[in-house]
């Protein structure tokens, strides 16, 4: 923590209490987004660990923080869920990260006006669930719907699922409120929205928004395959020309289909939790439309498909792709890293753009794209989200990364542009945003933020990173062959432990995309509200540890231990990582093998289990005191049977009625069973989850012997 932040600590603690953190670990976890900066470039960004992280819970608190920060010249970096890779949420000037996690309320839903008013930190999925209760739904949403925030999408700018019909997100915003550096609050609507949309918090901290929504209707999904990019272009142009009532158009390229087929499926202790659906190695287009329009679509689609050399795929594939539309990052497990490259190109040049990219980039390039019928210039546009599988642990990652600049340069050649500005492409702001918008942003920024405290170095800033990106763009002729010569290795390949982290867990730590799907639904996180308590926070910390920048301490050991093992993170994970199983493996490593301290009450439980066979410190001689006397002769330990009723510690010592009710039900059902009485010991599951695996094993062996 800097000396300046040290002087401000008392103010922040008195104002925000438990909603401000100065913890080294916490601050580090709020100093990055989903992208991994190559090691050769990282020095240009310098230290991005903020001095503090603050979580305001109201617009009033946000305004007070902004006014204080301006008076004290403290930089403020707003953070929704940091699901972008453009660096917009990275605190390049340190200062304070403003985490909007607690500003997550749905303020008002207007069914008649078809609008919703929300705080900026509300997650799309949460909002959609609230809308559904009133027969409404979102007009469009990002592919990061399970984790990203409404305010973050306005600040970043974007298009997503539903954008074929609804366009860019900004055009679906009625109004937005933002806090200015002087602590005042201004409402933006109409053309004025351009002063905060895509500005990434550089001109104001978005606090509240009103967006347009639509009636909730049944949707139908169709999947079409096309052999090449020009056929895809022809198909989509025909959809537009025929005015088919389509709500959303998504598509993937053949390499994405290939890698999805190779990607590991979700498992639960060796058993697959999902069916295997094999995709054809082709472009796969997913059309989504309202059920009431199905007849019109069905009448015209076959002719359009045939003219584009396409083929309608099975309903199984269509439903599988729609169900997994948020699991784009499953291919990251094969990397375990991805080099991102996101651009926007006109539909009319899409085929040529893709053909040129395939010629210039020989690395495996996976793409998922969204078609916008009415783009920013009134013409159809395609948002192309591309990834190159790579491995950030290898030095060669530094050579693969510049290929993203090649893709951006080719996009510009065909009338396109980078998707966003952020930290890396602020030097291309005029291409991304347009000259007139950049001029207005500069004027407004100069007027309201003369001290430059709001998200410095982004969008229209001129930092070292932006300068380096522009410079590198002039040397693509040199960087391109170097990146293409790197040998691409695809597939999970854990090779051995890294420091003391098991090989598979080490691989998963890098395979985690930091998408944040696991965060809000995590029991451990929502009881505390800080990144270190989330699965993605732990994965990132493990990377830092394996690279020698962090060391284990009791706080981090405790963070691994307090997971409730509910496994909801496994179900939410966009890469289908075995998260809970990894934490269990680390518990055994940290506690059983390295003899670190577990949660103190478990030490007492372990002692009681070894001595008396139970976690409640009851005497073994009293273990069977609960058993009904009238059933002792019929089902007691002297009665031989192939079936044993295992009561366990809690039923034996604490909640006797559980055991009593169970044995009476079994007896009434004429089930023959026996009971071990004092020979029975604890199930030892508490010893398993707290990492004391030696006690778990000894107790299990004792139970097996008793049977």
Residue ranges: model-predicted function:
Residues 1-28:
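A charged N-terminal "starter" segment
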Residues 105-252, 453-454:
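FAD-binding subdomain of flavoenzyme oxidoreductases
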Residues 424-493:
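Activity-critical C-terminal alpha-helical subdomain
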Residues 25-27, 31-103, 138:
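Glycine-rich N-terminal segment of FAD-binding domains in flavoprotein oxidoreductases
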Residues 88-104, 132-136, 159-170, 209-216, ...:
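A glycine- and small-aliphatic-rich helix-loop capping segment at beta-alpha/alpha-beta transitions
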Residues 22-39, 233-406, 410, 421-422:
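C-terminal substrate-recognition/cap domain of FAD-linked oxidoreductases
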């Amino acid at each position: 923590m800097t000396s300046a932040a040290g002087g401000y600590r008392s103010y922040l603690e008195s104002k925000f209490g438990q909603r401000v953190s100065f913890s080294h670990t916490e601050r580090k976890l709020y100093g990055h987004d989903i992208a991994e900066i190559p090691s050769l470039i990282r020095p240009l960004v310098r230290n991005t660990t903020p001095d503090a992280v603050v979580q305001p819970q109201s617009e009033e608190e946000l305004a007070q923080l902004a006014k204080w920060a301006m008076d004290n010249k403290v930089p403020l970096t707003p953070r929704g869920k940091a699901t972008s890779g453009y660096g917009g949420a990275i605190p390049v000037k340190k200062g304070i990260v403003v985490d909007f996690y607690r500003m997550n309320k749905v303020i008002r839903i207007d069914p008649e006006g078809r609008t919703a008013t929300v705080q900026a930190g509300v997650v799309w999925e949460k909002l959609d669930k609230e809308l559904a209760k009133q027969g409404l739904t979102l007009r469009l949403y990002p592919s990061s719907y399970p984790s990203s925030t409404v305010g973050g999408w306005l600040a970043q700018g974007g298009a997503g699922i539903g954008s074929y019909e609804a366009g860019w997100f900004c055009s679906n915003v009625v109004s937005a409120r933002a806090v200015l550096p002087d602590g005042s609050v201004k409402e933006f609507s109409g053309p004025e929205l351009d002063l905060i949309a895509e500005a990434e918090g550089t001109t104001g901290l978005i606090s509240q928004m009103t967006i347009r929504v639509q009636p909730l209707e049944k949707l139908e999904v169709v999947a079409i395959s096309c052999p090449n990019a020009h056929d895809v272009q022809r198909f989509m142009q025909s959809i537009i020309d025929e005015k088919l009532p389509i709500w959303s158009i998504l598509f993937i390229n053949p390499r994405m289909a290939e890698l999805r087929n190779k990607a590991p499926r979700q498992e639960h202790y060796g058993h697959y939790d999902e069916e295997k659906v094999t995709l054809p190695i082709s472009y796969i287009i997913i059309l989504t439309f309202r059920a009431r329009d199905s007849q019109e679509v069905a009448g015209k689609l076959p002719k359009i498909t045939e003219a584009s050399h396409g083929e309608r795929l099975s309903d199984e594939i269509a439903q599988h792709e729609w169900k997994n539309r948020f699991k784009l990052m499953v291919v990251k497990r094969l990397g375990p890293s991805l080099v991102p490259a996101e651009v926007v190109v006109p539909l009319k040049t899409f085929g040529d753009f893709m053909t040129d990219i395939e010629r210039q980039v020989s690395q495996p390039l996976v793409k998922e794209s969204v078609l916008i019928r009415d783009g920013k210039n009134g013409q159809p546009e395609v948002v192309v989200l591309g990834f190159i599988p790579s491995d950030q642990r290898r030095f060669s990652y530094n050579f693969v990364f510049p290929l993203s600049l090649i893709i951006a340069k080719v996009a510009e050649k065909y009338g396109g542009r980078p998707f966003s500005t952020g930290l890396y492409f602020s030097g291309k702001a005029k291409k991304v945003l347009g000259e007139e918008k950049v001029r207005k942003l500069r004027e407004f920024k100069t007027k309201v933020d003369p001290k430059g405290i709001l998200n410095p170095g982004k969008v229209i800033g001129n930092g070292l990173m932006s300068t380096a990106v522009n410079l590198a763009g002039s040397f693509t002729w040199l960087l391109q062959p170097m990146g293409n010569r790197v040998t691409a290795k695809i597939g999970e390949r854990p090779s051995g432990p890294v420091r003391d982290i098991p090989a598979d867990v080490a691989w998963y730590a890098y395979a985690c995309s930091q998408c944040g799907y696991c965060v809000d639904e995590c029991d451990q996180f929502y009881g505390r509200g800080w990144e270190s308590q989330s699965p993605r926070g732990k994965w990132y910390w493990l990377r830092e540890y394996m690279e020698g920048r962090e060391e284990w301490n009791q706080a981090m050991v405790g963070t691994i231990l307090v997971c409730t093992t509910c496994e909801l993170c496994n179900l939410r994970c966009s890469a289908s990582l075995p998260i809970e199983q990894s934490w269990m493996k680390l518990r055994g490593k940290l506690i059983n093998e390295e003899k670190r301290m577990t949660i103190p009450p478990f030490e007492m439980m372990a002692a009681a289990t070894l001595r008396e066979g139970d976690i409640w410190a009851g005497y073994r001689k009293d273990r069977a005191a609960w058993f009904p006397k009238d059933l002792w002769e019929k089902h007691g330990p002297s009665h031989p049977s192939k079936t044993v009723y295992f009561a366990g510690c809690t039923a034996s010592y604490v909640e006797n009625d559980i055991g009593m009710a169970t044995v009476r039900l079994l007896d009434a059902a004429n089930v023959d069973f026996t009971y071990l009485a004092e020979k029975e010991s604890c199930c030892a599951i508490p010893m398993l989850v707290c990492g004391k695996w030696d006690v778990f094993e000894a107790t299990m062996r004792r139970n097996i012997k008793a049977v």
